[in-house]
Swiss-Prot record:
The lineage of its organism: Bacteria, Pseudomonadati, Pseudomonadota, Gammaproteobacteria, Enterobacterales. It is found in: Cytoplasm. Belongs to the ClpX chaperone family. HslU subfamily. This is ATP-dependent protease ATPase subunit HslU. It comes from Buchnera aphidicola subsp. Schlechtendalia chinensis. Keywords: ATP-binding, Chaperone, Cytoplasm, Nucleotide-binding. ATPase subunit of a proteasome-like degradation complex; this subunit has chaperone activity. The binding of ATP and its subsequent hydrolysis by HslU are essential for unfolding of protein substrates subsequently hydrolyzed by HslV. HslU recognizes the N-terminal part of its protein substrates and unfolds these before they are guided to HslV for hydrolysis. ATP binds at R21. Its main location: cytoplasm. GO terms for cellular component: cytoplasm. Transmembrane segments: none annotated.
Length: 72
């Protein structure tokens, strides 16, 4: 959770601080792959969202300053 909140904070600091709405968009981006591809993995009942998963899905986006996706 800390890593997710930190990602939202970094994006808020980089563009415009829109508070919790930014956290919502970060969570939405993080869950996008699971939402669209979970039906392909019917045998997997547990999906672990740990720091490694969060880093894999959010760090590149933040480091590349590809933040246009987070503008509401």
């Amino acid at each position: 959770m800390r890593h997710i909140a930190e990602a939202a904070w970094k994006v808020n600091e980089s563009i415009e601080n829109i508070g919790a709405r930014r956290l919502y968009t970060v969570l939405e981006h993080l869950m996008e792959d699971i939402s669209y591809n979970s039906c392909n993995n019917k045998n997997e009942l547990v999906i672990n969202i740990d720091e490694e998963y969060v880093s894999k899905h959010l760090d590149e986006l933040i480091l590349n300053n590809d933040l246009n996706r987070f503008i509401l």
